[in-house]
Curated annotation (Swiss-Prot):
PROSITE patterns: RIBOSOMAL_S9. It comes from Thermoplasma acidophilum (strain ATCC 25905 / DSM 1728 / JCM 9062 / NBRC 15155 / AMRC-C165). This is Small ribosomal subunit protein uS9. Belongs to the universal ribosomal protein uS9 family. The keyword Transmembrane helix does not apply. It comes from the Archaea. Keywords: Ribonucleoprotein, Ribosomal protein. The gene is rps9. Gene3D superfamilies: 3.30.230.10. One of its GO terms (biological process) is translation.
Length: 129
């Protein structure tokens, strides 16, 4: 089963298959993910699914964005892969109740910068006198 997850500019693809319960991110075990808080965030779908997902191998390839965006995209892709592989609507509803972004992409992106200022909304001050 192949699923995707997106967050900001990061895109993650997860492949779920029967196995020993190993989760990899870009070929590395999830236990080696550099930031502990984000590692725990990535593992949330597996903790919620508990025994249902213990015999699934999930391989995630993630590109673009920063570490937080990649972690959120990976998390969504993993949750979708578990639901799609098990074909379990009850589990999907459980994910939605816990956190809607486990199943639905968080589509918020940074507003692009515009001319005449430092950011998307900020403008250079002008003097009237």
């Amino acid at each position: 089963m192949i699923t995707t997850g997106k967050r900001k500019t990061a895109v993650a693809r997860a492949v779920a298959k029967k196995g020993k319960g190993i989760v990899t991110i870009n070929g590395y075990p999830v236990e080696l993910y550099p930031v502990r808080v984000l590692r725990n965030k990535i593992m949330e779908p597996l903790l919620i699914a508990e025994d249902k997902a213990k015999d699934l191998d999930i391989a995630v390839k993630v590109r673009g964005g920063g570490v937080t965006g990649q972690a959120d995209a990976s998390r969504t892709a993993i949750a979708r892969a578990i639901v799609k592989y098990l074909n379990d609507t009850e589990l999907e509803n459980l994910f939605r109740q816990y956190d809607r972004t486990l199943i639905v992409n968080d589509v918020r992106i940074k507003l692009p910068k515009k001319a005449g200022g430092r950011g998307a909304r900020a403008k250079k001050q002008k003097s009237y006198r």
